[in-house]
């Protein structure tokens, strides 16, 4: 079966937004218009359309489906049919890892902002991640019909807060209750969508007099931005004073793909205005898989040679598993982005991260209103595989004879843990299975059993993250469980440097044990870390002349690392420690790896307490958006929680307070903030760093851990 859509007509995009910017409605409208345009013959009247949308909402596809495939030919059927794969991204900061993972497999992104609240703290986080992966993006300013909507304020915020080089290709026609449509600056016409049939039709009209001046000003800026794409366009612009429609679009496209500019459009998804033009923009200005940088990976050789995989069907198969979802009907769905080659159902492939062979059962593609089983997928495709056994998020799937690891995904360590206990015996068995499935789906969520108490402990990125896990246990897996008090993931470190001997000798007839090391234990510096900011442990060997044979050095490192997982103050893992093996001795017969591992752990156990060990606590970056009249209460409360206010900004809904607060003080904050501000304030929180805990906290932690 040959490829239906040529690769240059593919668009893999994400719709990214802050929680309340209207992403779900925007996505729903995208599915609505594309679903209709693809099956336009089947819809004879409005009723069928709306039924389909309600059913869609009941099934909640925009929330649960990790990737949806739809088709679009343009508002005026002016394009050949393009295939748009939409990858869903969550809006809440507890799921930042999910956003980052989805940005990894996108080629372009549409960032949805609210016309009245503008750039929110979360938007900044997502924008930073999109910069990191160099994702070309365009912005849709939504909710232009809302009270307080101000398109030009949002444009200003994009520049000020995100440093975005924005180029509006539309301006709004009216706002709030008077929002009528948009002015298209390329055609220099007004666009009015037909409200009677949900915006399926539109008309181009002359620009009203009161907007002519503003439209001319922004058009000039847009044409200049397009002209800067090349010398040829600039010469043409300087000669003629304007550019043709085709030249403007070509210039804007080129600069968008090079991440030099961000195009901005506006509308109201709820009122069926503007989303249709966003879809046209995706085709005209977002990249196809062949227009982005070829993905890099490590070859399966000893040197970890870097290789690239071009978006090409004839190249060896390589794909990234970017999300695992549990489906009540088919079991585990593994969503993959195919970067190169072709995969057929029934094929055997290799999971290069886990070094395991896998067989693909079935392959399905999610469409806006159905699930289609397909026989094969090609480079650039996004689909879900059924039947993969040991694949987790971030794994690479590749050709058995051409192995490559596309990336080693770094997942942050959880910062909060709670104990969960099933309410009944039948729940016990179901809970184990359910938690296993949820952990497979989400690598930033961990499950373990406490060896001393036998309790099941779940850990995640924040209170909301764990609340949602518990909610899913109840809703999807029908498991009722009680939740314990949240526990904080403390760490320990050292502030001084010591040298410590470790000697393990056992001689009792026959073969004995002999390991002897001298270790330098010292704080890990920024210089030691170099570019790897996330490094928490470093081992070095200064052994010369073989006083400790080379083959035992890895055992010394292992012994040191494992012992550092049991801190000296309250048993928490020790981080930011550098251990150097600088001397030792061995025995020809009695020395072995185990003896050196034990000697090394003895040296750490004795040496670490002498190196001025301290307890570290996770500190969170907190942003609170509050009406001005509650500012005093909110600030006072943050101070009581040992918070340090870093600064304040104005926002349309009051003030934004930026602070750092220890996680231990943030439990239950959502409820407290609601009652202090009559439910009018909101906050976001993300992990910032580990900092030394004050003595009162250290005492409490030691007493709690007995």
From Swiss-Prot:
Species the sequence originates in: Chromohalobacter salexigens (strain ATCC BAA-138 / DSM 3043 / CIP 106854 / NCIMB 13768 / 1H11)
Highest taxon of source: Bacteria
PANTHER family: RIBOSOME-RELEASING FACTOR 2, MITOCHONDRIAL, TRANSLATION ELONGATION FACTOR G-RELATED
Localization terms from the record: Cytoplasm
Purpose of the protein: Catalyzes the GTP-dependent ribosomal translocation step during translation elongation. During this step, the ribosome changes from the pre-translocational (PRE) to the post-translocational (POST) state as the newly formed A-site-bound peptidyl-tRNA and P-site-bound deacylated tRNA move to the P and E sites, respectively. Catalyzes the coordinated movement of the two tRNA molecules, the mRNA and conformational changes in the ribosome.
Record gene name: fusA
Main location, first listed in the record: cytoplasm
Name of the protein: Elongation factor G
Residue positions binding GTP: 17-24, 88-92, 142-145
Family: Belongs to the TRAFAC class translation factor GTPase superfamily. Classic translation factor GTPase family. EF-G/EF-2 subfamily.
GO molecular function: GTP binding; GTPase activity; guanosine tetraphosphate binding; translation elongation factor activity
Keywords: Cytoplasm, Elongation factor, GTP-binding, Nucleotide-binding, Protein biosynthesis
Domain annotation tr-type G: ranges: 8-290
Pfam families the record matches: EFG_C, EFG_III, EFG_IV, GTP_EFTU, GTP_EFTU_D2
CDD domains registered for this protein in UniProt: EF-G, EFG_III, EFG_mtEFG1_IV, EFG_mtEFG_C, EFG_mtEFG_II
GO CC annotations, alphabetized: cytoplasm
GO biological process, one term: ribosome disassembly
Database matches in InterPro entries: EFG_II, EFG_III, EFG_III/V, EFG_IV, EFG_V, EFG_V-like, EFTu-like_2, G_TR_CS
PROSITE patterns, alphabetized: G_TR_1, G_TR_2
